[in-house]
Amino acid sequence: MATAGAAATDLEVVRGKRAALFFAAVAILLGLPLWWKTTETYRAPLPYSEISGLNALQLRLMVPVTVVFTRDSVPLDDQEKLPFTVVHEREIPLKYKMKIKCRFQKAYRRALEHEEEALSLGSVHEAEALLAEPEKQAEGSLTVYVISEHSSLLPQDMMSYIGPERTAIVRGMIHREAFNIIGRRIIHVAQAMSLTEDVLAAALADHLPEDKWSSDKRRPLKSSLGYEITFSLLNPDPKSHDVHWDIEEGVQRYVQPFLNRLSAAGNFSVDSQILYYAMLGVNPRFDPASSSYSLAMHSLPHVINPVESRLGSSAASLYPVLNFLLYVPELAHSPLYIQDKDGAPVATNAFHSPRWGGIMVYNVDPKIYNASELPVRVEVDMAQVMEVFLAQLRLLFGIAQPQVPPKCLLSGPKSEGLMTWELDRLLWARSVENLATATTTLTSLAQLLGKISNIVIKDDVASEVYRAVAAVQKAAEALALGHLSSAFAASQEAVTSSERAFFDPSLLHLLYFPDDQKFAIYIPLFLPMAVPILLSLVKIFLETHKSWKKPEKID
């Protein structure tokens, strides 16, 4: 009986050891890896190598230029060499990591019969009407017509002409170096109509160091999918002035045609409002000599903040908001004039603030006070007002007056207020700006994810990153081929996808849950199970070790 009981006890001990070893093996080989896998931070793979390669991206902006030579524009020997292609490339000297080169591909050919007839007319506008085929010209392309040196199409003192469409006219010459001399003139004209250092520097103002390229006047509106424009009439003295403005007619007649032409760069929404008892917040200075009031240039920045609080918050808007304010000064401060830095009155009596909008002071004719009781009825001249606001709108979008070469006649814009090549130039600038923004966003995101290992990278975030990288590469290729429309669309997609990835809220889910907190939470859960297993393993180890050291009994 004693032997049977001892055998049962030994069997129970062996069974307990095996159970302890089994539980330990399951916990270590299955439980621990399963826990580690289920609690790890999911990070979808990203194209880090391609993102780092974006820092060394070189942009080649190709502008296709078709050069058409009429009879007697160059010597006969040179005409026999037509057609052929000449490429002019130069690097834009900007202090930016992205190297930008402008490539003008000039395709020389002879004029067709209808082109000869049009260019033989006596008026450049008649010639343009016959030559105008804007629907056949691709975005970003230019056509330059070279006419005879003695042609009466241009004034005798003018060597070139830039039209409202994608066309220009340059005088030729009978000279053995005609192609070289005319080629330089064509480059100067083409640069004025497309890409200059100023245009690209303004587009990259947020990415360049603080120097002459990044002053406030060179900071146009940032590229966006849409813009909201608000026209506000400020009447601080309704007891004296009963102001009426036909803003709907003014917008439809003057602003909407401009926005329709600009629709390729984004969507626009326009609204208006009238604010009573809205003061500027700055006390104007009285000038006894002219019996008028004035606002000095240094006080203009202080005008915006008090007024902005009355305009309504733009925080809920997804797009940039442009404010255009028409201010009718109160009777006690009339007339009111804005002064420039030299103290002289500004001709338009208006000023604009980059990326915010503009303010115009509209003085009431003092003659109406004599024959009328207060409040006097004030009819706003919308043509005068909208002319100023339209000029400010051009400046806010970075559509400045081009720097034309010497002896160049510049045509004014059509009724839309925007020339076709100005729109192309804006799209060039916006494409470069979008690529710079997208590459900066992707690089910053890659650096952030590399430094903080517990940021979750979901599959949809990774897909946005891949889409942004592909769009950047597609836009760069389209720019190199001169396909402006597709390049701009791809650059917009690059910015949108990169910002969606960067600002995705899922990136912050585990940002404030570091590894030490993970162990602090799970150790109390695992400790009650781990202590018995560990004690059993220690006991088994000690017994096994003791049995090995126990000497064998010799009979």
Swiss-Prot record:
What's an example Gene Ontology biological process for this entry? attachment of GPI anchor to protein
Q: Which residues cross the membrane?
A: 19-39, 518-532
Cellular localization per UniProt: Endoplasmic reticulum membrane
Ranges facing Lumenal side: 40-517
Q: Which UniProt keywords apply?
A: Endoplasmic reticulum, Glycoprotein, GPI-anchor biosynthesis, Membrane, Transmembrane, Transmembrane helix
Could you give one GO CC term from the UniProt record?
GPI-anchor transamidase complex
Asked whether the keyword Transmembrane helix is assigned, the reply is yes
Residues binding a cardiolipin are 15, 18
Positions annotated as glycosylated: 267, 370
Q: In which pathway does it act?
A: Glycolipid biosynthesis; glycosylphosphatidylinositol-anchor biosynthesis
Residues forming coiled coils: none
Question: Which ranges make up the Cytoplasmic topological domains here?
Answer: 2-18, 533-555
* Membrane topology qualifier: Multi-pass membrane protein
Q: What job does the chain carry out? A: Component of the glycosylphosphatidylinositol-anchor (GPI-anchor) transamidase (GPI-T) complex that catalyzes the formation of the linkage between a proprotein and a GPI-anchor and participates in GPI anchored protein biosynthesis.
Question: What family is it from?
Answer: Belongs to the PIGS family.
Q: How does it assemble?
A: Heteropentamer. Part of the GPI-anchor transamidase complex, consisting of PIGK, PIGT, PIGS, PIGU and GAA1.
The name of this protein is GPI-anchor transamidase component PIGS
- Organism of origin: Rattus norvegicus
Q: What is the lineage of its organism?
A: Eukaryota, Metazoa, Chordata, Craniata, Vertebrata
